């Protein structure tokens, strides 16, 4: 897997829109894991954003194994530009067919989006993808059938895929769902046949009309939560949603640690003043330097206190001011494990996680000076720890959350 490149700051004004990809899932009630699998990847050289939503037959661990195998293969084949019919043939030959139902053990939808607006969707027995313009209008997707013939030895069956090539524009959204969404509420009063595509489209249209800048992960979460609600709070099937949002990139600057030489304190302040986006300051000494150089007040935030974390602070024009080492370490732990990193009480970790996930291009400015309070034999270790945490944050943000990152040392 490609490692992040921390040596050069990112250009301030990228030309292409950013492709934000957000997902949310809920397992069938009573099962520990979701039988659907969602895989996503951003290719560094081409800038393409890939996503595969696979739905394993049944629910639980068995379905998860099958959907995971399907999704992993599909993502690999698409990233290597394998012919889609050949890729589907390999997947179908690998997965068995259910003898009782005569169905493949996993369905899937593949999304391949380029920064220049080209978008390809491949569907195999999943609910149809939905493309919305910025005004909420549904864009018809004209799909072409792709026939995958049975293997030459006759041991297997063929299938028909649906393929669509379309060009997206800024503020367009593409939504993928598993049938746990469209069939939510089936058999209940008002929705005897389930939620259905039409009602789902109307729900999404109302959401993005009310909140035009809604993040992809928030829209995916709202869709899944509504599906679960329609099932009475107990999902009757694995429920998944993936959202691609084409928009202008959101930038975040994370400043942590004082500069190596005090003469660079002004450079740190200039980085904050001239940054075209939101700013988070992580570190008490760093915050004091910024407040002094920027001539801004720095006050304690007594509203969001957490006994496990140092308190927050408030500085005009800064999105978040918090402690450094402990906060960043706990943030890293949340980002590296499964689940929503923003879940839980409002504190420095959940707020910083929200800023990172809501941003697309993240630049770290890391001070190379050891805090005066820590001038002891372990001082070099403190600096190495700070650098290591930032490197690991870069890696998880790029590989798991598809962010663009850069690091600059002062």
Show which residues each predicted segment covers.
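Regulatory cytosolic signal-relay segments
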Residues: 1-34
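C-terminal catalytic subdomain
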Residues: 2-10, 183-270, 274-276, 296-410
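Acidic loop->beta-strand submotif enriched in PP2C/PPM serine/threonine phosphatases
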Residues: 31-46, 139-187
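Catalytic core of PPM/PP2C metal-dependent serine/threonine phosphatase domains
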Residues: 34, 66-135, 159-161, 214-244
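Primarily the active-site beta-strand->alpha-helix module of PP2C/PPM metal-dependent phosphatases
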Residues: 37-94, 175, 186-201
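Conserved beta-strand-loop-short alpha-helix elements that form
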Residues: 47-59, 123-124, 165-190, 244, ...
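Short active-site oxyanion
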Residues: 117-118, 274-279
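Conserved phosphate/anionic-ligand binding catalytic regions in large, soluble enzymes, centered on
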Residues: 234, 277-291
């Amino acid at each position: 897997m490609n490692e992040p490149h921390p040596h050069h700051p990112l250009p301030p004004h990228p030309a292409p829109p950013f492709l934000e990809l957000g997902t949310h899932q809920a397992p069938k009630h009573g099962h520990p894991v979701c039988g659907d699998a969602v895989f996503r990847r951003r290719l560094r050289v081409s800038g393409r954003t890939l996503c595969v939503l696979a739905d394993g037959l049944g629910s639980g661990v068995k379905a998860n194994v099958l959907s995971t195998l399907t999704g992993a293969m599909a993502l690999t084949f698409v990233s290597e530009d394998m012919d889609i019919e050949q890729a589907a043939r390999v997947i179908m030959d690998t997965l068995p067919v259910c003898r009782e139902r005569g169905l493949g053990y996993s369905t899937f939808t593949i999304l391949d989006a380029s920064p220049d607006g080209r978008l390809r969707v491949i569907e195999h027995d999943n609910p149809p993808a939905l493309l919305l313009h910025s005004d909420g209008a549904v864009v018809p997707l004209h799909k072409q059938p792709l026939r995958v013939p049975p293997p030459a030895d006759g041991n297997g069956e063929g299938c028909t895929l649906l393929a669509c090539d379309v060009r997206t524009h800024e503020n367009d959204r593409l939504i993928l769902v598993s049938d746990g969404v469209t069939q939510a509420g089936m058999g209940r009063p008002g929705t005897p046949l389930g939620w259905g595509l039409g009602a789902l489209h109307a729900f999404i249209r109302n959401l993005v009309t009310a909140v035009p800048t809604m993040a992809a992960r928030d829209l995916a979460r709202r869709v899944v939560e509504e599906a679960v609600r329609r099932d009475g709070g107990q999902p009757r099937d694995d429920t998944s949603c993936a959202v691609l949002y084409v928009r202008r990139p959101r930038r975040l600057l994370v400043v942590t640690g004082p500069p190596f030489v005090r003469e660079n304190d002004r450079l740190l302040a200039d980085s904050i003043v001239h940054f075209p986006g939101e700013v988070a300051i992580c570190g008490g000494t760093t915050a004091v330097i910024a407040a002094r150089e920027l001539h801004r007040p720095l006050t304690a935030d007594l509203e969001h206190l957490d006994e496990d974390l140092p308190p927050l602070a408030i500085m005009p024009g800064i999105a978040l001011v918090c402690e450094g080492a402990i906060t960043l370490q706990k943030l890293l732990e949340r980002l590296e494990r499964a689940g929503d990193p923003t879940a839980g009480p409002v504190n420095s970790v959940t707020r910083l996680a929200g800023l990172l996930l809501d941003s697309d291009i993240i630049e770290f400015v890391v001070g190379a000076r050891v805090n005066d309070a820590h001038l002891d034999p372990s001082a070099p270790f403190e600096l190495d720890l700070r650098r290591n945490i930032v490197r690991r944050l870069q890696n998880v943000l790029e590989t798991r959350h598809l962010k663009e990152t850069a690091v600059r040392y002062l």
